[in-house]
A protein has these predicted regions:
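Conserved N-terminal phosphate-binding loop of PLP-dependent enzymes in the Aspartate aminotransferase
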Residues: 1-303
Length: 303
């Protein structure tokens, strides 16, 4: 995934002639020198990276506004980042985000934000990159996370889920972008076109199709969220249940009214479940979101 995002950033920069990349302030896209710049606190990000507040409904930029007004507030953050690049003499290359904001805690994204942000990026001469390393391959009940938010990116990156854990990654883009990239930049990878990785990747696609795992993720995910919702009345710290398919985020708080994040409490439950043989994690900018991501073969009986 790291290398896929690095190639995608390079492709966007070569294709547009720009350098500036917009990301969110709580994402994670890899650990190489260049890609890790997208995952640092805003004050540590260099001049060619601008981080915006990630769009969400639970802790919005401003309380008491309508859905459309909230969307506009977050879109203004995109516009402000573009203006800041222009003021610094840095042309825009694009915006890179996970389309379901997985590491941000799977927040409920204000309506039409992704589609309209993509339009703003295009109008400014940039490209929209969807990091599908976590969201892709039917995890959400759709093949791709960007389908959940009803938009089409210019570049899509993929990682180890496409090989079911075997090291495998990929970058997909429109033909003209790929042709332009190959014409202006020499890219070589010793491990490209590996027969073993290719065979595993094809096997993963076959299993997803023949075992109807996309539909399974959608149906079982709906059931699991409905069962978790029944627990809310008995579980005060469980403030909100979010996500799509078999990718679920639970907002864990110490006070529902004040929405006080409880990272320590979330970590306690992560470890308790680990002791019982269930592996989940904590995510989000505040570290208080329980991230539940079972295998695509997870059934109602398991749930």
């Amino acid at each position: 995934g790291t290398e896929a995002n690095e190639v995608a950033m390079l492709m966007a920069r070569v294709s547009t002639g720009g350098r500036g990349i917009i990301c969110t302030d709580a994402g994670y896209h890899g650990n190489s020198t260049e890609v890790s710049k997208l995952s640092r606190p805003p004050q540590d990000i260099n001049a060619e990276i601008r981080a915006i507040p990630y769009p969400q409904r639970y802790r919005p930029l401003q309380d008491g506004v309508s859905e459309s007004e909230l969307t506009e507030l977050y879109l203004d953050e995109v516009r402000t980042a573009i203006d800041a690049f222009q003021a610094s003499g840095i042309p825009l290359a694009g915006m890179l985000v996970c389309p379901i904001l997985a590491n941000e805690g799977l927040p409920d994204i204000p309506d039409s934000f992704m589609a309209r942000a993509s339009e703003i990026i295009h109008d400014a001469g940039g490209l929209f990159i969807a990091d599908e390393v976590q969201a892709g391959f039917c995890r959400t009940g759709e093949w791709w996370g960007y389908e959940v938010n009803d938009f089409v990116p210019d570049i899509v990156t993929m990682g180890k889920p496409m090989g079911n854990g075997l090291p495998l990654a990929g970058v997909i883009a429109r033909k003209e972008l790929v042709d332009n990239f190959r014409q202006h930049r020499r890219y070589f990878n010793t491990f490209a076109s590996s027969p073993l990785q290719a065979a595993v990747g094809m096997a993963v696609l076959d299993v997803i199709e023949t075992e109807n795992l996309r539909q399974n993720a959608s149906h079982v995910g709906d059931y699991l969220r409905s069962e978790l919702t029944k627990l809310q009345d008995r579980c005060e710290p469980l403030a909100e249940i979010r996500g799509q398919g078999l990718f679920i985020g639970l907002e864990w708080v110490s006070d529902r009214h004040l929405k006080t994040p409880d990272r320590d409490g979330a970590v306690v439950y992560v470890n308790r479940l680990k002791d019982k043989g269930f592996l989940i994690g904590n995510a989000g900018a505040l570290g208080n979101v329980l991230k539940i991501r079972p295998p695509l073969v997870f059934t109602r009986e398991h749930a």
